[in-house]
């Protein structure tokens, strides 16, 4: 596959791919490029030639046949010499097989080389099996929900792993599909499973940790020491804690273990407001309403100072936990009885939101407040953006703001505080390090300059102790390249790439920091604190 033709996400977060064929034989290349009609005529001519040879051979005696066989063997040897792979011109014998770039999975070309089967993400986000007729240049979906595929040895059937782990056999000649029934029973012994995972973790760290000396830790000693607690552990959460304890002895970032618990049956929804905990009396006194939240809508009729007395007819008792009244209510109409600040009681219908949506709204409010502060103190001359994560979505957001709304500002504040990382340092550096070299001016009117897709004016980067991973790497890059000043609190050194490995128990995963970054002096950035140019704790 190649990413030559497809779209690329910022920060190496994935690219669309295509399947490309390279012919290492000139004759095979010519045959592949034949049209459907030309291929049919060639097959017919080959069939006629074989029939003619068969008739000729049947009319000769065995002696002549032996001579013929010897001659055929000689010709076969000559033919094998002719079929040596031709690498020299390989790059000129390449062709893009797929007609649309997408996120690719498995792929397989049939024996005749005229049909390509591949799995790719469809417009709805579903992994789908496609078949492309290379002679007719037509692509059609075959089956949705296909996670992986493999052809049998003869190339007559495809075996498909479908959504949910099912197995399907598809005959390529007829196109028929039939489920493959199978059983894979096993006896699970959780204690033995944990023993295995623990030993596996010890080996993996010893083999893959970025520092061959394991930060000077006596790993064998700690492995024996913590093993004594295994017999006393009876659940995944405690086991993950044990793994985290021993991995913590490495004094490294990007490690520890996680236990993925099942989702709660009934998630507690939220009304999207902050309440006055010091308020006397029953109900919830609203201190502020979250913008774009359920209570901010005009028909909700809720304002700071109002008191929510009941939810779906259930009274809110002073000091009591009201969360049970909102269990499973996200996105569903809820009735609120409200006492307005003037003493009048009203009833409103609202749709509570999920905790995740509440966090997003709170984040947006924080960013908007920061924007207002910077705009106010600078008189509109300085812009402000916050990089939420070192990922493609965050990059697109700040790219639009920096080169859109703030294009005419004199400077930009790039806030990376509380960023959990990702992989975006080079994209940020390119965006913020533009050097203006030409202006465009028809008839004396300025209309723009190059580079148009980079910020060419001053910038400053805000950081804090909460910057992690590539949110350490990005300020390091920014500071090392001299793009601008770093302002804020020192950042712990955590610019290291991690491999989170899922275990045979799918509820358990642990991390191994495999690749650290070295500064220009060859020192690991792991555990190397970054000091801002101007230290301000906030």
Regions found by a protein language model. Give the residues of each.
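Conserved beta-propeller blade repeats
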Residues: 1, 9, 101-119, 141-161, ...
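A flexible loop/linker signature enriched in serine peptidases of the S9 family
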Residues: 1-73, 120-128, 162-168, 187-190
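Multi-bladed beta-propeller domains
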Residues: 24-49, 84-102, 133-147, 174-190
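Blade/loop signatures of beta-propeller domains
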Residues: 69-90
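Terminal targeting/pro-maturation regions of precursor/exported proteins
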Residues: 173-245, 249-250, 256, 280-284
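Cleft-lining beta-strand/loop regions that shape enzyme active-site pockets
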Residues: 208, 287, 311-315, 319-508
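Extended, small/polar residue-biased N-terminal targeting/export presequences
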Residues: 231-281, 343-369
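PDZ/PDZ-like domain segments forming the peptide/carboxylate-binding groove
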Residues: 266-319, 392, 515-516
């Amino acid at each position: 596959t190649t990413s030559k033709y497809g779209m690329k996400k910022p920060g190496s977060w994935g690219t669309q791919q295509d399947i490309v064929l390279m012919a290492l034989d000139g004759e095979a290349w010519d045959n592949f490029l034949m049209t459907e009609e030309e291929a049919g005529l060639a097959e017919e001519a080959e069939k006629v030639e074989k029939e003619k040879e068969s008739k000729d051979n049947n009319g000769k005696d065995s002696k002549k046949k032996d001579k013929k066989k010897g001659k055929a063997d000689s010709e076969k040897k000559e033919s094998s010499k002719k079929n040596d792979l031709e690498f020299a011109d390989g790059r000129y014998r390449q062709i893009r097989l797929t007609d649309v770039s997408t996120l690719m999975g498995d792929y397989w070309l049939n024996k005749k080389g005229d049909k390509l089967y591949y799995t790719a993400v469809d417009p709805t986000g579903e992994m789908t099996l496609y078949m492309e007729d290379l002679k007719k240049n037509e692509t059609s979906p075959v089956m949705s929900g296909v996670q992986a595929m493999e052809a049998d040895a003869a190339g007559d059937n495809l075996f498909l792993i479908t959504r949910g782990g099912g197995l399907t056999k598809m005959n390529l000649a007829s196109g028929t599909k039939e489920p493959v029934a199978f059983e894979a029973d096993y006896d699970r012994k959780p204690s033995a499973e944990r023993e295995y995972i623990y030993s596996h973790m010890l080996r993996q760290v010893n083999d893959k940790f970025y520092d061959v000396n394991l930060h000077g830790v006596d790993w064998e000693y700690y492995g024996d020491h913590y093993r004594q607690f295994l017999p006393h552990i009876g659940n995944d959460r405690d086991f993950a804690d044990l793994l985290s304890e021993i991995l913590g002895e490495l004094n490294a970032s990007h490690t520890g273990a996680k236990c993925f618990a099942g989702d709660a049956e009934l998630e507690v929804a939220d009304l999207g407001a902050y309440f006055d905990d010091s308020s006397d009396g029953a109900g919830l006194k609203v201190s502020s309403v979250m913008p774009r939240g359920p209570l901010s809508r005009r028909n909700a009729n809720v304002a700071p100072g109002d008191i929510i007395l009941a939810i779906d007819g259930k009274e809110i008792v002073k000091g009591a936990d009201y969360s049970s009244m909102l269990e499973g209510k996200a996105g569903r109409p809820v009735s609120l009885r409200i006492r307005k600040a003037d003493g009048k009681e009203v009833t409103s219908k609202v749709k509570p939101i999920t905790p995740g949506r509440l966090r997003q709204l709170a984040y947006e409010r924080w960013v908007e407040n920061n924007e207002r502060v910077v705009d106010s103190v600078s008189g509109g001359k300085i812009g402000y953006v916050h990089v939420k994560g070192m990922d493609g979505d965050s990059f697109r957001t700040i790219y639009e703001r920096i080169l859109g709304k703030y294009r005419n500002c004199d400077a930009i504040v790039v806030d990376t505080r509380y960023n959990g990382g990702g992989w975006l340092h080079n994209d940020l550096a390119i965006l913020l390090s533009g050097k203006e070299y030409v202006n465009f001016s028809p008839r004396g009117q300025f209309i723009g300059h190059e580079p148009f897709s980079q910020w060419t004016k001053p910038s400053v980067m805000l950081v804090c102790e909460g910057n992690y991973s590539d949110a350490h790497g990005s300020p390091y890059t920014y500071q090392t390249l001299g793009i601008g000043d770093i302002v804020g609190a020192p950042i712990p050194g955590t610019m290291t790439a991690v491999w989170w490995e899922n275990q045979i128990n799918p509820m358990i995963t642990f991390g191994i920091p495999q690749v650290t970054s070295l500064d220009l002096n060859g020192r690991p950035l792991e555990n190397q604190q970054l000091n801002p140019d101007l230290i301000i704790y906030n």
